[in-house]
C-alpha cells in the first residue's frame, strides 16, 4: 500500500495510541481532530487525508467510538535495537 508522508505521520500517532475524533452536523463532517496518546491535538489532519485513510481501510471506528488504526494500517518494521 502506497502512503504519503502525511498519512505516515498520522498512522504513526495512531499506532502509538492516538485517535481521530470527528464532529458532525447531520450527516456532514464539520471538524476532524487527531489526538496523540498524550492528549495533544495534532494539526496535520484534514478531510481529504481522513477520507484517504478511510478508503485504504487504515483507520476504522467501531460502535461510535473515535477512529483508531487497523491491522491493515500498521506496517511491520524490523527491530533495530
From Swiss-Prot:
Pfam families the UniProt entry points to: YjhX_toxin (PF09857)
InterPro entries assigned: YjhX_toxin
Source taxon at top rank: Bacteria
Family of this protein: Belongs to the UPF0386 family.
NCBIfam families registered for this protein in UniProt: PRK13687.1
HAMAP family cross-referenced by the UniProt entry: UPF0386
Name the UniProt record assigns to this protein: UPF0386 protein Smed_0945
Species annotation: Sinorhizobium medicae (strain WSM419) (Ensifer medicae)
Amino acid at each position: 500500500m502506497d502512503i504519503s508522508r502525511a498519512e505516515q505521520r498520522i498512522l504513526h500517532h495512531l499506532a502509538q495510541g492516538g485517535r481521530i475524533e470527528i464532529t458532525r452536523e447531520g450527516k456532514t463532517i464539520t471538524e476532524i481532530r487527531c489526538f496523540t496518546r498524550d492528549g495533544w491535538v495534532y494539526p496535520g489532519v484534514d478531510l481529504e487525508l481522513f477520507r484517504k485513510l478511510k478508503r485504504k481501510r487504515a483507520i476504522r471506528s467501531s460502535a461510535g467510538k473515535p477512529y483508531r488504526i487497523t491491522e491493515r494500517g500498521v506496517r511491520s518494521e524490523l527491530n533495530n535495537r
